[in-house]
């Protein structure tokens, strides 16, 4: 998998309430969640984000409540992946489980600016900043997690495995 997009940059400790405010948790519609993605971190984000744009954040992205709505909102907003210095553990697992690729790469976060265009090779964990020409390598996810992401999430992964008789 490869993604190319414009960067939206966020700071440290962006919690799940900033990603998708609690006032919208009465819906499970990905399309509705996307309309409010990141609005407490940047109120104009839902109107400005475009399909393919990439979120880059500092450390501890996705901390706070253990809501699966947060990575669902990001994915439904058309953001194909998130790059951060680190992720809260529960967000990390929820992102994998819904098929949202995430990459931990402190060097990339420090070197990428909002508005830069980056290309991410998800299979190799290579992040190329097309604006500056810099290349970074993210921590590789275990093969099992990569398989879940490539399947589109844990549910689809399990359905496929069952259908294959595995």
Curated annotation (Swiss-Prot):
Cleavable signal peptide: none
Pathway in which this enzyme or protein is active: Amino-acid biosynthesis; L-leucine biosynthesis; L-leucine from 3-methyl-2-oxobutanoate: step 2/4
Domain of life: Bacteria
Catalyzed chemical reaction(s): (2R,3S)-3-isopropylmalate = (2S)-2-isopropylmalate
Residue stretches spanning the membrane: none
Gene3D superfamilies to which the protein is assigned, alphabetical: Aconitase, domain 4
Coiled-coil zones: none
Enzyme class: lyase
Pfam families from the UniProt entry: Aconitase_C
GO molecular function, one term: 3-isopropylmalate dehydratase activity
Single GO biological process annotation from the record: L-leucine biosynthetic process
EC number: 4.2.1.33
InterPro entries in alphabetical order: Aconitase/3IPM_dehydase_swvl, AconitaseA/IPMdHydase_ssu_swvl, IPMI_Swivel, LeuD, LeuD/DmdB_bac, LeuD_type2/HacB/DmdB
Entry keyword set: Amino-acid biosynthesis, Branched-chain amino acid biosynthesis, Leucine biosynthesis, Lyase
CDD domains: IPMI_Swivel
The keyword Lyase belongs to this UniProt entry's keyword annotation: yes
Keyword Transcription regulation assigned: no
Function noted in UniProt: Catalyzes the isomerization between 2-isopropylmalate and 3-isopropylmalate, via the formation of 2-isopropylmaleate.
Record family assignment: Belongs to the LeuD family. LeuD type 2 subfamily.
PANTHER family: 3-ISOPROPYLMALATE DEHYDRATASE SMALL SUBUNIT 1, 3-ISOPROPYLMALATE DEHYDRATASE SMALL SUBUNIT 2-RELATED-RELATED
Subunit structure of this chain's protein: Heterodimer of LeuC and LeuD.
Name under which the protein is recorded: 3-isopropylmalate dehydratase small subunit
Gene from which the chain derives: leuD
